[in-house]
A protein has these predicted regions:
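Conserved ABC ATPase "signature" region
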Residues: 40-60
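Conserved catalytic motifs of ABC-family nucleotide-binding domains
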Residues: 87
Length: 172
């Protein structure tokens, strides 16, 4: 069932994709589609996910604010919070911090470390230090092929493949 599969996977792109309308509209989008909850339970779930993403206090609980008025980092966290509303088992991130400043990047990284305790997190990144800080396992790819994979600490401290060693020496 493709609908059930879609509900199990959250996708966060490189550039935040906020929907037209308010923060609340964005947060209720998937929740209204995939979950049958009372109005009170929907509101509680929205607040919980915004808090988890570290955004609720920053917007002072103003969910009627336009989503497009948020900063880039806030929009990225809104997208993460929106995905969390349906409790996905897997979250896929494509360069989640590439367009963010260091403060917002560190906030997103902290959130990803928290999320990976309960969900499977897959991150595509060219940022080696970010991979080292977040990932439990790393897959190093070149030209669409797996060069090496294993525990992140092992890959970064004792890479087995020459291409991995060369890449880490250049950028790691």
């Amino acid at each position: 069932d493709s609908q059930m599969l879609r509900r199990q996977i959250g996708l966060i792109g490189q550039q935040p994709t906020v929907f037209p309308g308010t923060i609340e509209d964005n947060m209720l989008f998937a929740l209204n589609y995939y979950k049958e909850l009372s109005s009170a339970d929907r509101k509680a779930k929205v607040i919980q996910c915004l808090e988890q993403a570290g955004l609720y206090s920053e917007i002072n609980g103003d969910m009627k604010r336009l989503a497009s008025s948020l900063s880039g980092g806030q929009q990225q966290r809104l997208c993460i919070a929106r995905s969390l509303t349906v409790d996905p088992r897997v979250m896929l991130f494509d360069e989640p911090c590439s367009a963010l400043d260091i403060k917002n990047s560190l906030h997103i990284e902290a959130l990803l470390r928290e999320l990976k305790v309960k969900q499977t997190i897959v991150i595509v990144t060219h940022n080696l230090q970010q991979a080292k800080r977040i990932a439990d396992y790393t897959v190093f790819m070149n030209d669409g092929r797996v060069v090496e994979w294993g525990a992140t600490e092992q890959i970064f401290s004792h890479p087995q493949q020459e291409l991995t060693r060369d890449y880490l020496a250049f950028g790691g």
